[in-house]
């Protein structure tokens, strides 16, 4: 029963991650023929992050590795479909952005400014701010590294 419920949760997570990936791809004017690939790549990225987190990785490292995967697949698909990799990758990583951590940090900052300094609120603010910043950094670095590796002009040695 455990593996079936895990696979169901994984499929649900991937399906729900594909929806905002397509939505943001439409906002970014991605061609209609590429929308399904943006959805698939968003689902792959979010699903791989969920698998890594359930395997014991923390969310920052899981996000970094998932962004590496999304960037690598996006570069390969861009070669196949003769499109820029950002068409596939940028909309695909948006479902992995840390909305809850950033929101909690913002609310903590507002509460500190409204009610005054509180050690609990400051700890909540700093921990959530650092978590959100780390995840955004992991997304941006993980998305850019495959391009640096695969489009390198000079020899590595």
Curated annotation (Swiss-Prot):
It is found in: Cell inner membrane. It comes from the Bacteria. One of its GO terms (biological process) is succinate transport. The chain crosses the membrane at residues 10-30, 55-75, 87-107, 129-149. Coiled coil: none annotated. Keywords: Cell inner membrane, Cell membrane, Membrane, Transmembrane, Transmembrane helix, Transport. Involved in succinate export with YjjP. Both proteins are required for export. Participates in succinate export, but also in the export of other dicarboxylates, such as fumarate and malate. Contributes to succinate production under both aerobic and anaerobic conditions, and increases fumarate and malate production during anaerobic succinate production. The transporter is composed of YjjB and YjjP. Belongs to the ThrE exporter (TC 2.A.79) family. YjjPB constitutes a split-type ThrE family transporter. This is Probable succinate transporter subunit YjjB. It comes from Klebsiella aerogenes (strain ATCC 13048 / DSM 30053 / CCUG 1429 / JCM 1235 / KCTC 2190 / NBRC 13534 / NCIMB 10102 / NCTC 10006 / CDC 819-56). The gene is yjjB.
């Amino acid at each position: 029963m455990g593996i079936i419920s895990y696979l169901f949760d994984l499929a649900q997570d991937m399906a729900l991650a594909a929806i905002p990936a397509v939505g943001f791809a439409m906002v970014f004017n991605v061609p209609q023929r590429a929308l399904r690939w943006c959805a698939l790549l968003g689902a792959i990225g979010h699903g791989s992050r969920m698998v890594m987190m359930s395997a014991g990785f923390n969310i920052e490292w899981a996000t970094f590795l998932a962004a590496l995967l999304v960037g690598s697949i996006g570069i390969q698909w861009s070669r196949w479909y003769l499109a820029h990799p950002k068409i596939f990758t940028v909309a695909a990583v948006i479902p992995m952005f840390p909305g809850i951590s950033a929101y909690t940090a913002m609310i903590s900052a507002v509460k500190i400014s409204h009610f005054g300094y509180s050690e609990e609120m400051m700890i909540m603010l700093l921990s959530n701010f650092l978590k959100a910043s780390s995840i955004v950094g992991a997304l941006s670095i993980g998305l850019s590294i495959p391009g640096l590796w695969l489009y390198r002009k000079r020899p590595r040695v």
